[in-house]
């Protein structure tokens, strides 16, 4: 009677609340059924042989719940529905999903280890992780997640906690654990803090033996218990008690999970925890060793636990409990009290979600784009910089660097290497951790030509048992690289870095993981694609304490999921359909689309093939003839840079820079007029037609209808006379003296080539200064640039712009400097040149001027073009270097005249703002936007209002330029409109760092899960 009175005093108030379902259900259960409710059995969705036996066990022993382990989401959902049908009282379904359901189930999102979350300064992101995991649990009918891990990782040799902990700082661990738990709670999922009273400072694995925490109670109270006390203060609904020997609390060597002093006295009475108390898995050797089957489960119940998790033998456990009841060692009142506590939890966490799991598109719903983006964000924000001598990172002045990477270890780092190549040319080497001294010396010799070495330590491991992957070959290598700039990238736990921390390294970055996403962000961090702001979750010796982390600025383009830049990736997928339809309709053999927003590339895909013969698929790294994009990618930046240097003035005349024009009608034309296409110059000179021998023709060269002479159809409404021949001393189809190569099998006589500048100089003017697009004007601008700089245009922009930017796949004359395999053929000109134009410029003027011209001739990739367009969006800076003054960018990119006169900026095209008039951009492009198109089917456009860059590349001129389906069907504008339709609503709240465990609720990423329509 005294025992029962004490028991009633200890029962939390929640057990006496009026809960009709709990009371009626409890009254309807027999004692045996109440005992069954105390057990959560192990379940697997990858073991068909166990399914029937488990269902029979549920029926026979009236199990209260299941904890699922490995398998697939679809099978687990089906099994959950099946097992729930077999249960009289709804089962409480649990999972050990610290990193999400993907921790256990294939094909689902697995979030990074808690150590990465501990490296993040923004607690709000941890809340969102918990919320996302909670959503996944709900989709799978999971009611309980055995997380967060509240252990403080103060022992580097801990074999079981390690990176599962948020770190070694008690405040950081507490805040992160509370944020994670509240995220779960926001989705109605029970969080269970573990491993009480703290598993962080152990050197043994409780799966195998009983670890000891050999500290005084005062130390445990101030370190190990600190996060748990914070969690309990927030109303933590569940706790998991570990199998630990803690002499300070119970000198009898009884595991904490079996100790009344720890479970009842410490947890319930001292810390006032009134939630559900779970044991750690009861099949672990740390608790079962030396005890007969079922004995430990009985002791756990007597200690004060509510739920026996993963019993070794449920039949033996039930038998032990019944025998204890018969002997009076345990009372029916205790069983009823524990059962009632479980039913109270079920009423809150199970009953509201008791409908069968919907398996429709389950895997798709478990992988929402917003959550894939959140996973990326975690890896990005965790990147930690602990050393940065002379502010080496982010790397600047790429034109001064010769970069090489070396993968130390035997795990491939392909993603890391490819990500480096987005920013600069990079040679790649590797060295095994088992390398000999001779191997090290050989690699050092191979690295001699390079002055910047990026080491990626793929040998690093998270386990103390493997000595964290240490090898003395890495220090030996670093010592031999003295005199070079050496950056170490560490993809593992901080503890693994300690032996290398004091080496002569210029910079040290931690990515904490070898995951491809982490590899990508490490590379981005090196070059300034992301801002680095992570903190150490655990110390690396005294030099680098927990919480330490340097910061860097974002200086270059980064790469991430569209949702992180406020774009809907599902909506952007419509671009794929438009491109495939365009290719199917033969608007072009292939194409590429790139979209960047807020300084991040969010979409970059290639479609189709280089040619209709389909021999080489298009790739995102392909190089295109960008035609008139040359104007804004080479000529225009040169003009702006010279304008900033006061070497060219907009209202100065051509004659100021080109004395040969002083006696011509071109002398008074100003630079401004050329940039506005208001100089009176003709659009172009038809040099091929100009060279046709009239004597070779019967009738006209071209006709709008078929005639006896004009028999070859070029396109609808255009026919050519195929019998034409070129005049002597103009062009030849065979190599001979005094002829220069134009394209394969096509040559120009040197006299005719020399006459082209003269023809341009004396070309006819229109007599008015109205807008009329002219290529000739940009040829004159090229000549002015070359006169001022005393260098060819291609050499000057390469040295002043492309190479410093890291745009090393951009150049004129690609056969001399670029990889021909990646160059997309522009045309198979069988009309005038009878040549395949593969690495030879398509534009006739540029071709006849030797391949370098101010109007065309440039070859480039989407990524390189994006770098230049981003320079414009950044008001003239890129990579931490200023190229053009911000005022100059503002001047050149704004409309110069009223819309009725000229919509253009200086060199840039602008949207047409007059209703009903054709526009180069889609109707959603704002007036502030600008860009340019190109004849080969290319387009580049910036929208500063929305911080958008859109690039479209194609070779629509293959096999010939007379295919205008791309323009007629408005393919480029269609895609641009899709981009605008994908813009997500602007949010007032932004992700911010937090110092209070309550502040994280204000934290948000660009696309909150609550706004997802397709995946709720």
Give names to the regions the model predicted.
Residues 574, 581-592, 614-677, 764-777, ...:
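Short active-site loop at a secondary-structure junction
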Residues 64, 237, 342, 583-617, ...:
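A short, well-structured edge-of-sheet supersecondary motif
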Residues 559-597, 601-603, 769, 786-791, ...:
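Catalytic loop of the DD-peptidase/beta-lactamase superfamily, centered on the K-T-G motif
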Residues 18-57, 269, 291-564, 568:
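Preference for extracellular/luminal or secreted protein segments
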Residues 18-109, 450:
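N-terminal hydrophobic targeting/anchoring segments and the immediately downstream early-domain regions
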Residues 666-927:
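Short, surface-exposed loop or secondary-structure junction motifs
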Residues 1-20, 998, 1002-1016:
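Bacterial Sec-dependent N-terminal signal peptides
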Residues 30, 66, 74-91, 101-103, ...:
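Second-shell residues forming the walls of enzyme active-site clefts
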């Amino acid at each position: 009677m005294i025992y029962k009175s004490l028991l009633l005093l200890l029962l939390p108030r929640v057990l006496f609340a009026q809960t009709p379902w709990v009371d009626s259900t409890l009254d309807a259960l027999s004692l045996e059924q109440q005992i069954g409710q105390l057990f959560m059995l192990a379940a697997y969705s990858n073991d068909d042989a166990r399914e029937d036996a488990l269902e029979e066990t549920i029926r026979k022993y009236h199990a209260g719940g299941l904890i699922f382990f490995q398998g697939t989401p679809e099978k687990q959902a089906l099994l959950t529905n099946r097992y729930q049908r077999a249960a009289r009282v709804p089962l409480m379904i649990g999972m050990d999903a610290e990193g999400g359901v993907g921790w256990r189930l294939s094909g689902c999102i697995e979030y990074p280890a808690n150590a990465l979350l501990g490296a993040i300064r923004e607690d709000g992101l941890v809340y969102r992780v918990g919320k996302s995991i909670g959503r996944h649990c709900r989709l799978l009918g999971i009611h309980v997640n055995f997380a967060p891990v509240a252990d403080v990782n103060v022992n580097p040799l801990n074999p079981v906690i390690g990176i599962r902990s948020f770190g070694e700082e008690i405040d950081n661990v507490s805040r992160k654990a509370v944020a994670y738990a509240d995220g779960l709670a926001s989705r109605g999922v029970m969080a269970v803090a573990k491993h009480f009273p703290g598993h962080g400072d152990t050197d043994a694995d409780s799966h195998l033996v009983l670890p000891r925490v050999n500290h005084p109670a005062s130390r445990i109270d101030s370190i190990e218990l600190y996060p748990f006390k914070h969690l309990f203060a927030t109303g933590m609904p569940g706790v998991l008690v570990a199998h630990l020997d803690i002499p300070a609390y119970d000198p009898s060597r009884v595991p904490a999970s079996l100790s009344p002093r720890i479970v009842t006295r410490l947890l319930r009475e001292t810390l006032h925890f009134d939630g559900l108390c779970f044991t750690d898995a009861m099949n672990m050797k740390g608790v079962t060793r030396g005890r007969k089957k079922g004995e430990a489960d009985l002791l756990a119940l007597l200690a004060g636990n509510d739920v026996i998790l993963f019993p070794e033998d449920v039949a033996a456990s039930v038998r032990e409990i019944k025998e204890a009841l018969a002997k009076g060692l345990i009372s029916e009142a205790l069983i009823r009290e524990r059962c009632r506590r479980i039913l109270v939890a079920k009423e809150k966490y199970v009953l509201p979600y008791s409908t069968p799991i919907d398996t429709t598109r389950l895997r798709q719903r478990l992988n929402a784009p917003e959550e894939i983006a959140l996973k990326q964000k975690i890896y990005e924000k965790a990147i930690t910089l602990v050393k940065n001598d002379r502010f080496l990172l982010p790397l600047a002045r790429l034109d001064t660097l010769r970069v090489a990477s070396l993968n130390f270890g035997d795990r491939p780092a392909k993603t890391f290497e490819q990500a480096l190549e987005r920013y600069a040319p990079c040679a790649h080497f590797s060295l095994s951790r088992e390398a000999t001294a001779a191997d090290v010396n050989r690699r050092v010799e191979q690295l001699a030509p390079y002055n910047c070495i990026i080491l990626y330590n793929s040998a690093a491991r998270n386990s103390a048992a493997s000595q964290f992957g240490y090898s003395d070959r890495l220090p030996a290598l670093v010592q031999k690289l003295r005199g070079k700039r050496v950056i170490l990238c560490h993809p593992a736990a901080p503890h693994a870095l300690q032996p290398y921390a004091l080496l002569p390294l210029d910079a040290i970055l931690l990515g904490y993981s070898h995951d491809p996403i982490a590899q990508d962000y490490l590379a981005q961090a090196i070059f300034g694609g992301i801002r680095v702001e992570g903190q150490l979750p655990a110390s690396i010796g005294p030099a680098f304490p927990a919480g330490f982390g340097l910061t860097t600025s974002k200086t270059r383009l980064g790469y991430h999921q569209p949702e992180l830049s406020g774009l809907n990736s599902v909506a952007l997928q419509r671009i794929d359909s438009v491109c495939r339809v365009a290719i199917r309709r033969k608007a072009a053999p292939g194409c590429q689309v790139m979209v960047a927003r807020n300084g991040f590339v969010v979409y970059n895909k290639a479609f189709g093939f280089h040619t209709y013969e389909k021999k080489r698929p298009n790739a995102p790294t392909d190089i295109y003839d960008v035609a008139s994009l040359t104007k804004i990618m080479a000529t225009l930046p040169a003009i702006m840079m010279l304008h900033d240097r006061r070497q060219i003035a907009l209202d100065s005349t051509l004659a100021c820079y080109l004395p040969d024009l002083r006696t011509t009608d071109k002398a008074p034309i100003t630079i401004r007029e050329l940039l506005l296409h208001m100089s009176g110059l003709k659009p172009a000179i038809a040099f091929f037609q100009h060279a046709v021998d009239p004597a070779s023709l019967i009738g006209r060269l071209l006709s709008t209808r078929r005639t006896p002479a004009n028999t070859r159809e070029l396109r609808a409404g255009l026919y050519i006379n195929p019998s034409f021949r070129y005049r002597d001393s103009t062009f030849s189809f065979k190599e001979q003296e005094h002829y220069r190569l134009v394209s394969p099998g096509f040559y120009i006589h040197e006299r005719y080539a020399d006459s082209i500048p003269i023809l341009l100089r004396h070309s006819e003017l229109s007599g008015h200064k109205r807008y009329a697009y002219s290529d000739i004007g940009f040829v004159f601008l090229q000549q002015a640039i070359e006169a001022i700089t005393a260098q060819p245009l291609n050499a000057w922009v390469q040295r002043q712009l492309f190479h410093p930017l890291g745009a090393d796949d951009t150049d004129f004359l690609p056969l001399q400097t670029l990889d021909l395999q990646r160059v997309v053929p522009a045309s198979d000109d069988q009309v005038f040149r009878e040549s395949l134009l593969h690495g030879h410029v398509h534009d006739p003027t540029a071709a006849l001027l030797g391949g370098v011209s101010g109007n065309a001739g440039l070859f480039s990739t989407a990524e390189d073009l994006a770098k230049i367009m981003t320079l414009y969006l950044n008001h003239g800076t890129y990579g931490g270097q200023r190229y053009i003054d911000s005022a100059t960018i503002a001047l050149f990119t704004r409309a110069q005249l009223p819309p009725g006169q000229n919509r253009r900026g200086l060199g840039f095209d602008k949207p047409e703002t007059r209703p009903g008039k054709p526009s180069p951009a889609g109707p959603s492009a704002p007036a502030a936007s600008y860009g340019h198109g190109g004849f080969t089917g290319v387009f580049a456009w910036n929208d500063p209002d929305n911080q958008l860059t859109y690039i479209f590349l194609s070779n629509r001129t293959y096999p010939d330029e007379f295919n205008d389906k791309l323009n007629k069907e408005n393919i480029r504008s269609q895609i641009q409109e899709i981009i605008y339709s994908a813009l997500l609503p602007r949010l007032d709240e932004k992700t911010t760092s937090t110092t209070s465990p309550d502040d994280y609720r204000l934290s948000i990423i660009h696309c909150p899960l609550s706004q997802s329509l397709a995946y709720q």
